[in-house]
Amino acid sequence: IFYPSVGLSAVISSMADLSKAGISFLKVRGSYAEVGNAPERYITGPNYTLTNGVVSTATIAPAKHLEAERTKSFEAGLDVKFLGNKISATATYYNTNTYNQLFLYDAPPSSGYKQKYINAGKVNNWGIEASAGYKNTWRDFSWATTLNFSMNRNKIKELVPEGTRDPDTGSLVDIKEVNKDYGGYRVKLVEGGSIGDFYVKGLLTDDKGHIYVDPNSNTVLLDPDPEAYIFAGNTEARFRWGWNNQFSYKGVSLGVLIDARIGGRGVSATQALMDRFGVSQDSADARENGGVWISDDQQVPDAKTFYANSGDGMAMLSHYVYSMTNVRLRELTLGYDLPSKWFRNKVNMSVSFVGRNLFMFYNKAPFDPEVTASTSTYYQGVDFFMQPSVRTLGFSVKLQF
């Protein structure tokens, strides 16, 4: 299989004198590449399972007509430095299209299988990565700072092209959407949507959209419609920022890294279950306040029954959708270079303290948005009794001979 790639760059500052504009370095670059991704293992033959001595027949047909997933990408950018390299900036734009992804679809009964594989789909990703930096030295003091920015947008351009036929039977293959359900959480892939779009089950509402309170039990009810999913958002961040600062003065160095994730939404099944069993702060507040406020002017007095319905596992998650925007102190370092004369100029020794993931300046979710149940397409942005995020503290000694 042929996967071509080509790259081209030009250092403009070497071709022309840009010093009058204050530019000490200017480079432009571009590239194009195609890469492949092999299908899953063991799908070209029938798979049988053995359970308690009983062999189960294969339900997914062996994949006979496979093509490798293919990604075509284009990238363009520039690097520039000003004022004798004291100020620097980079910017990159990329655009990728991925084809021939592997889907499972319901097979015709005559095939003897429940599902079959097919190569289809087209997903577009485009984004921008940029950074700006400044560094300078004033006698014994130096400072270097870098601000990073990135964003990515994706769009499902196509699932299965209209008119696609089963390679074995010739019957039409019609896939309008791909759904993956986990209780009241659904990931839906549909043309025009984005990877990361998710939907949740909600409470029963009246004709005006207000939460319905049953007059007999004086509590809320789950929406009985099995397809009554509410669009909750997308798990992907809208933007990401990072700000790194390095200070140095007479052998003492200080490094501070702050980063931010802006946008994206997730759900907390952990919070739902804690409410369900009455061991959360919200359930304690509801008991103390005489019930649960479901709107500005509507209260359900029976907190126990309310949380039994709304927090029953992952059955109803519309009340447990949170913004995953957060800003944190990602890393802090403090070091000291011991004078080399202490070691007769034969050894350079430095000691440093390092702290990572120390605390958050801002986070409204009851979980760490950077910790997720899975990195797969279908289970991101879900908090389900995840391991707590870790704050680490360390100390290092470095010797150079």
Model feature map: region roles:
Residues 261-350, 354-356:
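Extracytoplasmic gating/loop element in the C-terminal half of outer-membrane beta-barrel translocons
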Residues 146, 156, 227, 237-251, ...:
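Conserved SET/PR-domain catalytic core that frames the SAM/AdoMet-binding pocket
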Residues 226-228, 239-240, 252, 312-320:
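Short, flexible active-site loops
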Residues 1-181, 316, 321-401:
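Extracellular/periplasmic, surface-exposed regions of secreted and cell-surface proteins
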Residues 52-54, 103-106, 217-223, 302-311, ...:
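Active-site-adjacent bridging/hinge elements
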Residues 118, 137-235, 283, 295, ...:
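Conserved small-residue
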Residues 232-268:
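Glycine-rich, aromatic-lined ligand/substrate-binding cores of catalytic
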Residues 46, 93-95, 259-262, 271-272:
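A short beta-strand motif that forms part of the nucleic acid-binding face
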